[in-house]
UniProtKB/Swiss-Prot annotation:
Family of the protein in this entry: Belongs to the universal ribosomal protein uL10 family.
Lineage: Bacteria, Pseudomonadati, Pseudomonadota, Alphaproteobacteria, Hyphomicrobiales
Name of the featured protein: Large ribosomal subunit protein uL10
Name of encoding gene: rplJ
GO cellular component terms, semicolon-separated: large ribosomal subunit
GO BP annotation list: translation
Keywords: Ribonucleoprotein, Ribosomal protein, RNA-binding, rRNA-binding
Length: 172
């Protein structure tokens, strides 16, 4: 890799770190090419990407940013899983790590915060944005139905009481 190629690679890495909602760093030693292709496909379908980069170039890319601490994670065979959606990269990475024991999640970045392995696993257990939206809509629909029933209940009781009174008077 010549100097110009390295410069292009560093700018690509800087762009990934600055524009992604989440970035997960993982070791992939012992993972087959087919498994990496499968990971790339899953991440791409979810709107993200997977990048294998030289550790030295990653360290240069983050050296002038607030993400300098993430460079400590880049030791050995490391790759980056990234996405604009903050939940996608952690969720897919942790799921892939559960299926492939050689794939080890080391940590990552959420927005501009550096996270450890446990934090990435906790984030992976959260629902994605579509899941959160559906939960909010369900809660609104359920509560609005309860409100309508609550508002209709007194009217129904009054109508029943008047109807019973009228029936009683007609019988007398």
């Amino acid at each position: 890799m010549n100097r110009q190629e390295k410069s292009v690679e560093i700018s690509e890495l800087s762009k990934i770190f600055s524009s992604s909602g989440s970035v997960v760093v993982a070791h992939y030693k012992g993972i087959s090419v087919a498994q990496i292709k499968d990971l790339r496909k899953k991440v791409r379908e979810a709107g993200g990407g997977v990048k294998v980069a030289k550790n030295r170039l990653v360290k240069i890319a983050v050296s002038d940013t607030s993400l300098k601490g993430v460079s400590d994670l880049f030791v050995g065979q490391s790759l980056i899983v990234y996405s604009v959606d903050p939940i996608v990269a952690p969720k897919i990475s942790v799921s892939f790590a559960n299926d492939n024991k050689q794939f080890v999640v080391l940590g990552g970045i959420l927005e501009k915060d550096i996270l450890d392995q446990d934090s990435i696993k906790r984030i992976a257990s959260l629902p994605n944005i579509d899941g959160i939206r559906s939960m909010i809509i369900s809660a609104i629909q359920f509560n609005s139905t309860r409100l309508v029933n609550l508002l209709n209940a007194p009217q129904t009781k009054i109508v029943r009481a008047i109807s019973a009174f009228v029936d009683k008077n007609q019988q007398s």
